[in-house]
């Protein structure tokens, strides 16, 4: 994209009414959520697209840079940084990444042009504790909605390792 598309901060999201945003980002690349004539992006999507130079975010006539969006995200979610690392890794690999809060996970991940997601991603820090009940509950939900449960573990260097968790019925 040549000139960044302008988006406006609105609470914990950003939006644009520009047709270019809707066509290039939503229709062609699977970013955001379309509501009426507005394309809404999460802060993580906005940070990613700002870092790539595809959009610019404005709040009260002030442009928010990538670091500003990361700081804003971190102020609202202490795990924003690691969620961003995983989001960026998956997007850079060519996947479509959407929220999976209604499934009790962080992300739903789609192959490009797929109608349904294949994976539910739960993001964790390397030293974060996770109980067997947490793992079982997430694997059970994923199995129930015909998705693969994946734990995305982020180490202190920002590297991500993915572990598939399966529900096996004997």
UniProtKB/Swiss-Prot annotation:
GO biological process, one term: tRNA-type intron splice site recognition and cleavage
An annotated Gene Ontology molecular function: lyase activity
EC number: 4.6.1.16
Entry similarity comment: Belongs to the tRNA-intron endonuclease family. Archaeal short subfamily.
Function: Endonuclease that removes tRNA introns. Cleaves pre-tRNA at the 5'- and 3'-splice sites to release the intron. The products are an intron and two tRNA half-molecules bearing 2',3' cyclic phosphate and 5'-OH termini. Recognizes a pseudosymmetric substrate in which 2 bulged loops of 3 bases are separated by a stem of 4 bp.
UniProt-annotated catalytic positions: 110, 116, 147
Gene3D superfamilies per record: 3.40.1350.10, tRNA intron endonuclease, N-terminal domain
Record's protein name: tRNA-splicing endonuclease
Enzyme class: lyase
Matches recorded under CDD domains: tRNA-intron_lyase_C
Protein keywords: Lyase, tRNA processing
Domain of life: Archaea
Catalyses which reaction(s): pretRNA = a 3'-half-tRNA molecule with a 5'-OH end + a 5'-half-tRNA molecule with a 2',3'-cyclic phosphate end + an intron with a 2',3'-cyclic phosphate and a 5'-hydroxyl terminus
